[in-house]
Amino acid sequence: MLKALEKAGILVEALPYIKKFSGKTVVIKYGGAAMVNDQLKEAVIMDVILMKLVGIHPVVVHGGGPEINGMLDRLGLKSHFIQGLRVTDESTMEVVEMVLAGKVNKEIVALIQRFGGKAVGLCGKDGGLIQAKKRFELVKNEGGARVPTDIGFVGDVVKIEPGLVRELADRGYIPVIAPIGVGEKGESYNINADTAAGELAQALKADKLVLLTDVEGILRDRKDPSSLISSLRIDDVPALVEEGVISGGMIPKVACCVEALQGGVGQTHIIDGRLPHSLLLEVFTDKGIGTMVLK
């Protein structure tokens, strides 16, 4: 009886959020452990389907780093690095596109269909969705100066054409997007999945951008999970970076959130994808589960 009452309480708590976000767009960056562990995969997919069933328009942008690395190893393609940055040559880009737009994307679509949802898989080339240009990374030369360096088919987003995604969502489908951009000459570019999700959220005028990660959120003390910062504002970010609270791989994720907020997205969230149903807990409960970044 106690468990039944708890479940009823959770449903009641979710009601105002369901009403608030019905008809709204939520862009979800899906990656990390939640893509590797079968139980977590199913939990994320069920969360996304439930969001759709209660009237929210979820849009999924996915990564696929481990799958790409596995396929490169299987094909015997060695990765070249410049100061820690992978150089994506033509052969590597072919594998990236094959794995992201083919294997990973269609697996997610099939899983959504299996659990009762309707999904359509896209990559950024479809309908000119993600238009991109070559990215030049600033890399230190022998003299210590940071100079623009060509790292291959890695791209920056130039423009998002969201019409196709919006139409699919309005027709009851869950769009699932592989972050492959298209250049002026039709060439493919590998786009960072966080960046692609943030840019798409802005173009769709999304109410929420949710980044699934392999950490609890932003912690004041990385060794203490209880030090989670449940919410912060853009103005708080510079000081937290200066203090080292936001550091390493969290810096580009927070920067993605800041840019999305400045581009008109309502709220952004960094949550722990290792926790089953973290997506629902963040969207539909009072306390949430990760870090919410607000304007």
UniProtKB/Swiss-Prot annotation:
Classification via Pfam families: AA_kinase (PF00696)
Top-level EC class as recorded in UniProt: transferase
Keywords attached to this entry: Amino-acid biosynthesis, Arginine biosynthesis, ATP-binding, Cytoplasm, Kinase, Nucleotide-binding, Transferase
Molecular function GO labels: acetylglutamate kinase activity; ATP binding
One of the GO BP terms on file: L-arginine biosynthetic process
Entry keyword annotation includes tRNA-binding: no
Pathway: Amino-acid biosynthesis; L-arginine biosynthesis; N(2)-acetyl-L-ornithine from L-glutamate: step 2/4
Top-level taxon of the source organism: Bacteria
Annotated site residue numbers, Transition state stabilizer: K29, K253
SUPFAM superfamilies (UniProt xref): Carbamate kinase-like
Cellular component terms (Gene Ontology): cytoplasm
InterPro entries xrefs: AceGlu_kinase-like_sf, AcgluKinase_fam, ArgB, Asp/Glu/Uridylate_kinase, Glu/AcGlu_kinase, NAGK-C
Catalytic activity of the protein: N-acetyl-L-glutamate + ATP = N-acetyl-L-glutamyl 5-phosphate + ADP
Location(s) in or outside the cell: Cytoplasm
Residues at which substrate binds: G64, G65, R86, N190
EC number: 2.7.2.8
Family in the record: Belongs to the acetylglutamate kinase family. ArgB subfamily.
Function of the protein: Catalyzes the ATP-dependent phosphorylation of N-acetyl-L-glutamate.
PANTHER family (alphabetical): N-ACETYLGLUTAMATE SYNTHASE, N-ACETYLGLUTAMATE SYNTHASE, MITOCHONDRIAL
Name of the protein in its database record: Acetylglutamate kinase
Gene label: argB
